[in-house]
């Protein structure tokens, strides 16, 4: 049954959903990687699609920018449409010198300056982590394709334009691999409602040095990331038998 933000019916979504921030990226993923594609959502322009990848039913839908937006869509997909696994696929900014442009980062955990998980967890710190099997499958999928990935902590920021640039030094000290805006929220939603989640990001810019990828470089690395995500789903299916 449709929700206030998703005009689909039960069964329209697969049990696994890839979620980029940009709904046009969702459209690109569906048109480039999936077959027999059907559009299943267009409320507020947040496009969602379902198709097949190598015969496996998979959905893809945008989640917008920031934890409040992605939390709405993740929650409704899980509680109203039976989604079991969410893979966020997006971009991040690096703060460490050893993390390079175009690196693919798998978010094993996600720190945040948001208070949403404290609200969920009775004002205590909650360790927002990805599902282990999904993480392992993504690493294995990358290795099978000959791609190197970095695995570690992300930082999910509430503000894109931060008033506290000194925080980047703290992130660097604590080994944060990338800064984005959603992973901690999605991990919190998945935990609250009994689902599983993973975040895979490509490094699109270096926050400290100011380096940025070109549009062509972003597209190539983005496609590598999507293939890792899709192949990891197939590996997960093999484990379930």
From Swiss-Prot:
GO cellular component terms, semicolon-separated: cytosol
Keywords, alphabetical: Glycosyltransferase, Transferase
Enzyme nomenclature, EC number: 2.4.2.1
Binding site for phosphate: 21, 25, 44, 88-91
Cited SUPFAM superfamilies: Purine and uridine phosphorylases (SSF53167)
Catalytic activity of the protein: a purine D-ribonucleoside + phosphate = a purine nucleobase + alpha-D-ribose 1-phosphate; a purine 2'-deoxy-D-ribonucleoside + phosphate = a purine nucleobase + 2-deoxy-alpha-D-ribose 1-phosphate
Protein's name according to its UniProt entry: Purine nucleoside phosphorylase DeoD-type
Lineage: Bacteria, Pseudomonadati, Pseudomonadota, Gammaproteobacteria, Enterobacterales
Name of the gene this protein is made from: deoD
